[in-house]
């Protein structure tokens, strides 16, 4: 019998082992769809971004006009721009759900996969941040100024670091140029780290909702999960296209319709919705350095999660107390997101401080305690 090229060709063999003949657990639910959705989001963002970059000018006097020109005069430029801007939102929705799945089902116990995932999240956040500055609207400019200025709180080297990042004494032309270079580069870095992420995942194989070994019952990825992923993709693209075509500016800031002006500060400086939870945590601490440390901790805390797992069971499927706590954490993050969008005044200040405190308390103290308690209740 002639050898199957899919299994013998050096390149196709790799694709085959990753996407076609990959042995997958037979019982993974729709929560396992988000990995492939993230891959599609990345490809969509790279494609639309590349098309936008061909019409964009990274210069403070031309950036705003070049984006407006793209939307008005380039064939389907408005569509490409709307897909790119809202694609970022869907990218973050998918990554948050993907992380939530990992937390709920104990996927973080695959430490290498989890750690590369956290690095991917940080890189994605950096990419989205520098990208938000490029249209050079009011919120772009002031967002860049406020967030980069936080680094000046780092003792001894802070101010030097910020001026080095800006390329001057304020956010100006050199800043915009380097942010464009970074925004162009980082998605390809994300693609590279994604390959590493998948390599680590395929070392162990996927986890499943029961948290037990699935070696006794595996099915090929294609056709089962390839078709399931296509269904997930269709279900994601419906709200994505609805948003991009019917209300493309819903998640944007109206301030960005005004070109950047260093002499006029917007009344409420706030980032895009997907950074609001972290922004609320920064603002809840009156000290600048404390705020920066809390900001870093709010995301880096994910790296500690494998070490805070005290339960004898991997997933939360059969742990009702941990489940309740998980949803309290989700509600807490939604409250933080809401607080981040509100002005710094009573009662939002105290609500933000309580939500920030409970966020760290739940993850660092309550989760391990509940896990230990459940072990005792089940006589483990």
From Swiss-Prot:
Binding sites annotated in the UniProt record for heme b b566: 98, 197
Main subcellular location: mitochondrion
TM stretches of this protein: 34-54, 78-99, 114-134, 179-199, 227-247, 289-309, 321-341, 348-368
GO biological process: mitochondrial electron transport, ubiquinol to cytochrome c
Cofactor: heme b
GO cellular component: mitochondrial inner membrane; respiratory chain complex III
Membrane topology: Multi-pass membrane protein
Binding positions (a ubiquinone): 202
Binding of heme b b562, residues: 84, 183
Subcellular location: Mitochondrion inner membrane
Cofactor binding description: Binds 2 heme b groups non-covalently.
Record key words, sorted: Electron transport, Heme, Iron, Membrane, Metal-binding, Mitochondrion, Mitochondrion inner membrane, Respiratory chain, Transmembrane, Transmembrane helix, Transport, Ubiquinone
Stored Pfam families: Cytochrom_B_C (PF00032), Cytochrome_B (PF00033)
Function: Component of the ubiquinol-cytochrome c reductase complex (complex III or cytochrome b-c1 complex) that is part of the mitochondrial respiratory chain. The b-c1 complex mediates electron transfer from ubiquinol to cytochrome c. Contributes to the generation of a proton gradient across the mitochondrial membrane that is then used for ATP synthesis.
The protein's assembly and partners: The cytochrome bc1 complex contains 11 subunits: 3 respiratory subunits (MT-CYB, CYC1 and UQCRFS1), 2 core proteins (UQCRC1 and UQCRC2) and 6 low-molecular weight proteins (UQCRH/QCR6, UQCRB/QCR7, UQCRQ/QCR8, UQCR10/QCR9, UQCR11/QCR10 and a cleavage product of UQCRFS1). This cytochrome bc1 complex then forms a dimer.
Extra facts: Heme 1 (or BL or b562) is low-potential and absorbs at about 562 nm, and heme 2 (or BH or b566) is high-potential and absorbs at about 566 nm.
Family: Belongs to the cytochrome b family.
Annotated protein name in UniProt: Cytochrome b
């Amino acid at each position: 019998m002639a050898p199957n090229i899919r299994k013998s060709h050096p390149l196709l063999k790799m694709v085959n082992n990753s996407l076609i003949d990959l042995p997958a657990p037979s019982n993974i639910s729709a929560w396992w769809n988000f990995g492939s959705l993230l891959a599609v989001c990345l490809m969509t963002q790279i494609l639309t971004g590349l098309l936008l970059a061909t019409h964009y000018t990274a210069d403070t006097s031309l950036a705003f006009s070049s984006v407006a020109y793209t939307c008005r005069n380039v064939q389907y430029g408005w569509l490409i721009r709307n897909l790119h801007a809202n694609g970022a939102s869907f990218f973050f929705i998918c990554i948050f759900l993907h992380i939530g799945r990992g937390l709920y089902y104990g996927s973080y116990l695959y430490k290498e996969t989890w750690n590369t995932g956290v690095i991917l999240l940080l890189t994605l956040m950096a990419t989205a941040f520098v990208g938000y500055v490029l249209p050079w609207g009011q919120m772009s400019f002031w967002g860049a100024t406020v967030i980069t200025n936080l680094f000046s709180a780092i003792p001894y080297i802070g101010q030097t670091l910020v001026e080095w990042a800006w390329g001057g004494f304020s956010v100006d032309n050199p800043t915009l140029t380097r942010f464009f270079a970074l925004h162009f580069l980082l998605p390809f870095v994300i693609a590279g780290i994604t390959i590493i992420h998948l390599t680590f995942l395929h070392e162990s194989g996927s986890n499943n909702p029961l948290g037990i070994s699935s070696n006794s019952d595996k099915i090929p990825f294609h056709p089962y999960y390839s078709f399931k992923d296509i269904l997930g993709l269709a279900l994601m693209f419906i709200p994505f296209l609805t948003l991009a075509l019917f209300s493309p500016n819903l998640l944007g800031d109206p301030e960005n319709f005004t070109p950047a002006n260093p002499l006029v500060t917007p009344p409420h400086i706030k980032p895009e919705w997907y950074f609001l939870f972290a922004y609320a945590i920064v603002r809840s601490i009156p000290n600048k350095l404390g705020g920066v440390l809390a900001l870093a901790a709010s995301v880096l805390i994910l790296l500690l999660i494998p070490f805070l797992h005290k339960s004898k069971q991997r997933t939360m499927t059969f742990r009702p107390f941990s489940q309740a706590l998980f949803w309290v954490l989700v509600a807490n993050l939604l409250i933080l997101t809401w607080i981040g969008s509100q002005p710094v005044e009573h009662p939002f200040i105290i609500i933000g401080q309580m939500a920030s405190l409970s966020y760290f308390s739940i993850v660092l103290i309550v989760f391990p305690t509940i896990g230990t308690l459940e072990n005792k209740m089940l006589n483990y």
